[in-house]
Amino acid sequence: MSAADYQRPHYAPGVPAVVALPTQPLSTVLDDAAKRFPQRIAVDFLGTNITYAQLHTQVQRAAEALRRLGVRKGDVVASILPNCPQHLVLAYATWRIGAVLAEHNPLAPSSQIEEQLKLHGGKLIIGWEKSLAQLDKDINLRDYNVYAVNMTSALPRHLQAALRLPVKAARAKREEMRAPVPSWIGSWDRLVASSPALPADTALPDVNDVATLLHTGGTTGTPKAVKLTHMNLGSNTAMGLAWAGPHVKDGQEVFYSVLPYFHAFGLTLSMLCAVALAATQVVLPKFSVSLVIEAWKRQPCTF
């Protein structure tokens, strides 16, 4: 049966009824964007700008850091992060080496995260300092290999300096973004910064390999870890771009990435579709009217 037999008259003009299945793993989405638009701003994080070339370099370093930690194809890497540049880098690095990214809500109760960790069996955790500080109080994190993300390390230098000021407003903002973690927990930011790039000849995963585990809400039963392959997520990306296709242009769009990366919608729309378009992502760790207004002054959104 041909694609013409699947035409949908209720679809918008120009939207195909059938899209081609992806033949390459998810990490190649970023590879392609970095080749086509290396100097395009990939990420705006509260004023910090990261180009696609820089993002690609960070991903290659993070991939090698994971490999040197012993992560191999099929191993699970637990991400307990809000939207931030480190989250984006970790995802593409994990996919690049064929490992599986298990997404967790960083604001979820410790008991829920503990059950999810047991469910997928991953032993490496990359987490936000505030999430790890709470988890360390509630569960035995020493059963895992744990690295902390300092979200303020991705801020512009002037904002980092402002957070160190001995004033109430700076202290409140610092406490909102950071928390002290035990000394045995490593620094993910420092590890990636000191790592060389992944060897270029490192084998890519197959499109049918599992790429991500997303956890269901458990509304109708026990929460489950849903296995999503590179094919699953690549197909979702292709379909999303097919619907948006007549209205977006490669290398010209600005997405406001406020939908959580750890949810299917945010992962597909922002982490994948935006990168496939070589769009600029204004990455927002949470929704805030003031954050959006400030972002609009820097980068008015198109999507």
Regions found by a protein language model. Give the residues of each.
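A short helix-loop-beta submotif of the ANL/AMP-binding
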Residues: A63, V76, P82-A102, P106-S110, ...
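Flexible, non-catalytic linker and terminal segments flanking ANL/adenylate-forming cores
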Residues: M1-T23
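Structural core segment of the AMP-binding/adenylate-forming
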Residues: R68-L69, R96-R190
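Conserved S/T- and glycine-rich ATP-binding loop of Class I adenylate-forming
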Residues: V77, T94, I125, V210, ...
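Alpha-helix-centered segments that form part of catalytic cores
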Residues: T23, E175-V207
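Conserved AMP-binding/adenylation subdomain of ANL enzymes
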Residues: G234-V254, F262-F303
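Conserved AMP-binding/adenylate-forming core of the ANL superfamily
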Residues: A20-P22, D31, Q39-C84, L88-Y92, ...
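Conserved adenylate-forming
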Residues: L66-R72, S195-N208, L213-S257, L277-Q281
